[in-house]
UniProtKB/Swiss-Prot annotation:
GO BP terms, alphabetized: cell division; cell wall organization; peptidoglycan biosynthetic process; regulation of cell shape
Superkingdom, natural source: Bacteria
Species of provenance: Burkholderia multivorans (strain ATCC 17616 / 249)
Catalytic activity: UDP-N-acetyl-alpha-D-muramoyl-L-alanine + D-glutamate + ATP = UDP-N-acetyl-alpha-D-muramoyl-L-alanyl-D-glutamate + ADP + phosphate + H(+)
Residues that coordinate or bind ATP: 129-135
Metabolic or biological pathway: Cell wall biogenesis; peptidoglycan biosynthesis
Gene3D superfamilies with a match to the protein in the record: Mur ligase, C-terminal domain, Mur-like, catalytic domain, NAD(P)-binding Rossmann-like Domain
Similarity-based family: Belongs to the MurCDEF family.
Disulfides per UniProt: none
Official protein name in the record: UDP-N-acetylmuramoylalanine--D-glutamate ligase
Keywords: ATP-binding, Cell cycle, Cell division, Cell shape, Cell wall biogenesis/degradation, Cytoplasm, Ligase, Nucleotide-binding, Peptidoglycan synthesis
A GO MF label: ATP binding
Amino acid sequence: MFGDRQRPMVLVLGLGESGLAIARWCARHGCRLRIADTREAPPNLAALRAEGIDAEFVGGPFGPALLDGGVEIVGLSPGLSPLEPALATLLAAANERGVAVWGELEFFAQALRALGTSGYQPKVLAITGTNGKTTTTSLTGLLCQRAGKKVAVAGNISPAMLDRLAAAIDDTALPDVWVLELSSFQLETARTFAPDAAAILNITQDHLDWHGSFDAYAAAKGRIFGATTTRVLNRDDPVVMKFAPAAGAADAPRTITFGLNEPTQDGDYGLSRDNGIAWLVEAIDRDAPDETAPTTRRRKRDAHTPDIAHKRLMPADALRIRGLHNAANALAAFALARAIDLPAAPLLHALREYRGEAHRVEVIATIDDVDYVDDSKGTNVGATVAALDGLAQKTVLIAGGDGKGQDFAPLVAPVARWCRAVMLIGRDAPAIRDTLAETGVPLVEHPTLEAAVHAAAALAEPGDAVLLSPACASLDMFRNYAHRADVFRAAVDELAIDKGATP
């Protein structure tokens, strides 16, 4: 379970969800445990004690002394930035002493490898990206389930991977397929993780305060791929496409692309428009030796100039999730499921069934022919750009919060195109206002989200949307993005009552 180490001493840094899961997993396998957190009494400490986990707890600043006493592995929680000075010093000391630094994902990968010696060989699908991870992960899990597989969905989406694995072992119900949502934080410490297929949905600015630079952030996303992992890549995103192997490279991993245009390579996915109808399609090489075989067996890129036809899968309008960005997410999920040779028919039925996730471009009410849309999970600029372009209607946008050091310039074009006005809230409202001034769109700052909702409602016209897509984190005003969504929904409910409507 721990490479070539037998019951090692493990130092767990950070007692959040992943840190607690690492502690549980290590205790389960007889490891000696030391747990450290910068907080003297982190919320999960009570759970640790209640579960009877035998561990030394150290609260307060991190330092190299935490490695004393024979620590062999450091288990690093994903919320802790390795650039933070005290943690950076500790990790440098660990490196000097030959102490391994693993995150939960690496513990999980090592556990699957150990279970493999007993014959357990599940398929593993992984999803990352700045935006769309949770939707695509949930949808991929549903697709695999509808194809008759026993599925476990875990990771950044919750539950923690190690908790889900422990429960499956205890229930003697190990899944056929693991579908994992993975953040850049989780991937930063990946070493041996090698899923069967993995998707990068998009890469735009986010978490620059944690990674230090955009290049470092993008590189962390790329750690989702093992040497033989089938790569599912968004061809509309040039940063993502940097992870495509060079054409004709020896031993190159299989690559499948998806996008919102027509695919031009055998086995790729995209959209094709005919008589005003957008179709989800798969590119089929008419000259392939067996067009009925799964893509993974008939793909032969660069073998010749392909004669491509587009096989219609379903109308994009048949998806219950709104927006072109969600059509892209659906294509990515379908590509992942097909990459492990699941049959197409049940996958297409599942695509029509999926209703989406809360707080992700979710229409929560229509009042006086104005849609009120909750995209509180839109915590970065890329998410808000996708929401505006995906809705593709006149919108009064509510944005603002903690910008995390982002550049707001990518908002200029979609705001100029789609927004009737922008209501601004939170710490970085002035920075967003300054960036968007060139659009000529009315920009109004408000002290509260409730005030912004009522002002937006007064400006919206029939056929418009009032969209909460903050492009920012929430912690400057709210407990989390879900709390922000709750406040938005309550304000919309109040508005509906005032207007005598049913939200």
